[in-house]
Amino acid sequence: MTLADFGQLCKEDLEVDRQLDALLKEQMVRTDDEAPSVIESRLSGWWAYKLGLSTPRIWLEVDDLERAKRVQAREGGDLDSIVDANKQRSKIDEQRFDELYGLLPQQTEPYTHIINASDLNAQEVLASVLHILEEY
């Protein structure tokens, strides 16, 4: 399923987001030995913030062109079309998350750290995140 397909599914059925976010929050509050050490999701920083969890909340920021290049590398396609599709997806997601939860994923309020990853490769992003986790 592509990002666009998933976005369309979520737009048509808000229950998809509600169920996924409920599962995500369940995992975030676990304290057993099998609890996840790292959780990645567009809203995980928000949920950790709203749940009052004392944990690093990291937002990876990338510019529109770099985001499109990464999608292109993963899924193929025309770069200009991907830029347009990403903008449309972001607009739809903003409307959906505002309707569901009254928040926008890209608002930086809940995040303890923001990494501009536009000029970083995957290994550099990982190193930056590990540095934050080791210091926390």
For each feature predicted by the language model, list its residue ranges.
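ATP-dependent small-molecule kinase phosphotransfer cores
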Residues: M1-K50, D64-L65, G76-D78, K91
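Conserved short-loop catalytic and cofactor-binding motifs
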Residues: Q8, E12, T55, H113, ...
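Short, amphipathic alpha-helical "lid/cap" segments that border enzyme active or binding sites
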Residues: D17-K25, A122-L133
